[in-house]
Amino acid sequence: KVKSLQYIGSFIARAKKLSKTQIIFVASYLTSWLNRYVLEREDEVDQSGGMERFKHFYAAFQALCYIFCFRHSLFRDGDSWECEIDKFFQRMVISKFNPLKFCNENVMMMFARIAQHEGVVYCFSIIENNNNERLRGIMGKADSNMPSSASSTGTSSTSSWSLVARQQFIDLQSYFPYDPLFLKNYKRMMRDYYIEWSDVSGDYESDESDEYDEMNKDT
């Protein structure tokens, strides 16, 4: 299911011949599924178990963000947004699932820049908080990295399993099946069918938001 979502997200983002109707239909389906998922399962976040339990949520959310990064202009409907995508993202980023933390970092950072520029949702305060939490976690592990009797019990094996599972989860989120292959002849054949990031990125790639620049200065 995760791989299928990655293929859908990458294809909808990159395929040049798709109509607006087709793109909005897929986005509408994803937003409906994600909204329902949050309503039904958000309380489970407070229960025991790793966040990889919700990998289908993160794969679907990341696919939608990836689509939005490439197709955000098509989501505009006058003064409003198709699928009420602005209200949707505003709800999702503050959910207990915290997708800005657990989805692919590069995709989330680019989504945050575009979403802020388009007035959809502001993400950088949450990203900063996530980074601070991660830093505190790393420092805490360094302080507690001392021999103890607990290291010989099942606790260490549980922790090791969690680390392995988390790495597999992160690796899975980093798969983009329709990322470009730099083959000159093939590229000429595909230019009428394939959207390069440079076709839609504008200044987003080179000009990070002022907020993010300030955030980096403080870290």
Label each residue range with its predicted role.
Residues 1-219:
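Eukaryotic scaffolding regions of large macromolecular assemblies
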